Amino acid sequence: MPLPSSQPSASSSPNLKRKQPTISSFFTKKPQAPKQSTSNEGPAPIDNDSEITDKLAEDDEEDIVAPVPKRTKSNGSLTVNRPQSPKAKSVSRVEQESSQRTELSKFASSPAIETEGNEATELDGSAKVRQQEREKLHQRFVRKLGGPDCLVGIGRNCVGETTSIEEAAEGDEDDETPQPVQPKGKAGKKGGGKLTPMEKQVIEIKKKHMDTILLIEVGYKFRFFGEDARIAAKELSIVCIPGKFRYDEHPSEAHLDRFASASIPVQRLHVHVKRLVAAGHKVGVVRQLETAALKAAGDNRNAPFVRKLTNVYTKSTYIDDIESLEGSTAGASGASATGYILCITETNARGWGNDEKVHVGIVAVQPTTGDIVYDEFDDGFMRSEIETRLLHIAPCEMLIVGELSKATEKLVQHLSGSKMNVFGDKVRVERAPKAKTAAAESHSHVSSFYAEKMKSADAADDEVASNLLQKVLGLPDQVTICLSAMIKHMTEYGLEHVLQLTKYFQHFSSRSHMLLNGNTLTSLEIYQNQTDYSSKGSLFWTLDRTQTRFGQRMLRKWVGRPLLDRRQLEDRVNAVEELKDFRNVVMVERIKGLLGKIKHDLEKGLIRIYYGKCSRPELLTILQTMQMIAQEFADIESPADTGFSSPAISQAIMSLPTILKDVVFFLNKINMHAARNDDKYEFFREEEETEEISEHKLGIGAVEHELEEHRPVAGEALGKKMVTYVSVAGIDYLVEVENNSPAIKRVPASWMKISGTKKVSRFHTPEVVKMIRQRDQHREALAAACDKAFLALQAEIATNYQALRDCVQSLATLDCLVSLATLASQPGYVKPEYTEETCIHVEQGRHPMVEQLLLDSYVPNDINLDSSKTRALLVTGPNMGGKSSYVRQVALIAIMGQIGSYVPAQAAKLGMLDAVFTRMGAFDNMLAGESTFMVELSETADILKQATPRSLVILDELGRGTSTHDGVAIAQAVLDYMVRSIRSLTLFITHYQHLSAMVHSFPDGELRNVHMRFSESGTGADEDITFLYEIGEGVAHRSYGLNVARLANLPAPLLEMAKQKSAELEEKIRRRRLAGFVAAVGAVVQSNQADESVIERLVSSMEEL
């Protein structure tokens, strides 16, 4: 098939044949091959190449990147060969591969090899045309698939150099060493190829971090290799290219020659890191520490890029989440963990069984805020103390130092092992060894760590630093062991500096707060409901009206640690009252307006600045927000100017303007527009730039000036006065020449063709190439200098961290007080009255959470408990009558009062309770091999050990896990002990009517019987019960369990049988009691002198009837 007339035939174009030799042509003898001309014929031959290229192109206007001219020696003379166009080169490559395949398929003894080679060189014109057409179609197919020779790939690689150093290095790292052609008749060895230089780097880094998923930066992507690729593909739903998954030379993978791999774009790094971290993985980021321009100027230009593990992330240490810094509140659907990482260690257990004791130390760190909590304590065989601290702190990660006892290990597994646990998500657990001399080694390690801090402290801070150091060195041994392990652990993530913030060390067991143990947090639903473990329906959800994230975190601490100091409580509740009543309307609106303007988590932002991990736009936003906060109340000079009488409000407002001077000082160094656009080169104002930055900027300016001066020189070569530079596809300083102009014939051979279209060609002169390389080197050095100066600025701001953090804490206090004031302004809430007496007197109290979730109105009830009067209530009533809701309501009102909140009631007088204990619900503990009844009694035993006369104790149906006689006996003994010995305020729920007789044992009314009221209608099968949900005096002698069975839709025949059996049992018991009464009367009649025991028996029999 002949070519169209517009194209010369292949056979009639010796120029084409001469300019497009294939690689195989150098190894195949060709008869009468014309000698290659050594003369420089200018760009004329290229025109023919361009015509062929244009013919093969799908789009005539598409940019084509030209290869670089190559120099070869022929017969001792240097020859400059004009390179082929990319498409022609691809055609020749196809010919080469075809030739190689043909050579491999021939027999060595075949006499026709030479003949066939000669015949191939003497193809007629039509055969060559057909071959070219096939190659043209194949080339289009390759282009559609984006092969290695496609125009897009070549265009990206040719940026001012013969080949992009970065991409060339990637190719060198990925490609294995070419294997020599196997001798004929021998099979090639499968797999087991040499590792590429980059794969050797990966293995070297991976061997040091086998527990970490590594993301390796390779050019424009981050790649996973081996087993990491399989995990990433599963978690991120990305493609995994098959290959070796193991990092050792295992025989099972001997047939594979490449690692399995997966990749993500550079700009999506933190999106995917966040997903991997949330799934519980430890993730490491390995970055290239060299850039293409600097590598080109260095001595190791042919070596692979230097790579290093720069960042390691886990759930608690992932502080680079920019999204979490934005938004006013953490409106998560579930009740997630608090971001703490908790380190725990314990000594060997002492004792056995129920007498087992362990000595435990903990240190919990919140890297995102800088808070640190520590404690040392003894715990019993139920591990209730450990459970309490775990539920309060709610860590998302745990570090276990040494071996734990069996009971502790089971508790940790139970609380952290499931995604639907009380922490809201699965907890990541790591382990660290513990030496026999751990205490001494830890003291030495901690001392050296804080001694270095003291060396760097200013002279003015020496005394403060010394006091803080003494405080740290005075920590108990178990806490010091945990602190040492935490320092080592946080150093791995580059966050060890957070442990230098000793001002924020807090002791967990401080007696300035009410104790809420693990059972209480769960039973009263303080942080989470017991249905789906979300925050909705919890006490925290009810109180939370905060507008900032740092305010929300502070309120969470307030809820979990109610105050014991009456004066502090009154200050807080008076502040809430002032904000609620709008006594100073203008100032209240200013506070609310200021809180509403804050859209970033300043507490997390400040700690990121402290770590040196803050971005430029984020730094600008934080400083501008802090400036706005400080300026809002800059006119306040004294507490009287605030207009508030409450010290809590006035002190918080007074502390806000103190940071204004420092914040303005830092902002004056920053170019606002550049910082907002994340422009590192112009981030600093000109007068604030470092000498290094200025030097490299001048260097870039000098190079750009030389490039401008080169324009006339380049124009002279083309016969013009001056050329105009153009920029195309990110490539600058291109000299553009029209293909149909006379200038195209004047282009020197030394000029490098970078790209072109049908109408124009674009070139770089050798001088431009050299100057662009110099400019790029200056740019890379400038970028490093800008990063260095930015880190120095963050370090300078970090010296004022505590002052800035105190300002944020003051703002958080105002946010919490405004939140409580918003709640207090709702109808039916009252300010509680506080007293030093141990009492709870509430009129028309309501359940704070249930009334918000119910569509109907909640039925209020009174409660009167006093240590000097009635201090215990025995609560009875029908099933589903509201007993548990009533006792929970009492406990929640007491806790709300000591938080400093208004309470849902008409009136409330509250004493200072030191703890609230609950024993509610029935469940077993299969992990510990304990039955339901064993769990009940163990928890009750813990309460009896810890309760004091100032505690509130709630016991719900104690003794139901065993037989009636044993259950009644245990319940009666526990209740008697609580009222007589411990003298706590007690609410005791039971269905044992026999216990109601205990009130006669307390003639002064320390124990009273109350019941949940109800009304009956109908008789027999038509009996109907209406729950009134009101508390009344006396005892409910029936539980009406059959009514609940009917509501549960049990089968009708079953209900009838149950009614019949219930009636028979009641009649039997009634006859027995009647017989007992008759016997008691007979005993009185027969005895001449009725002693007290006989009289008591008679009275008891009458009450039973």
UniProtKB/Swiss-Prot annotation:
UniProt biased composition (Basic and acidic residues): 92-104
UniProt source species: Emericella nidulans (strain FGSC A4 / ATCC 38163 / CBS 112.46 / NRRL 194 / M139) (Aspergillus nidulans)
Similarity annotation: Belongs to the DNA mismatch repair MutS family. MSH3 subfamily.
Listed name of the protein: DNA mismatch repair protein msh3
Biased segments, Acidic residues type: 167-177
GO molecular-function terms, A-Z: ATP binding; ATP-dependent DNA damage sensor activity; double-stranded DNA binding; mismatched DNA binding
SMART domains hit by this protein: MUTSac, MUTSd
PANTHER family (UniProt xref): DNA MISMATCH REPAIR PROTEIN MSH3, DNA MISMATCH REPAIR PROTEIN MUTS FAMILY MEMBER
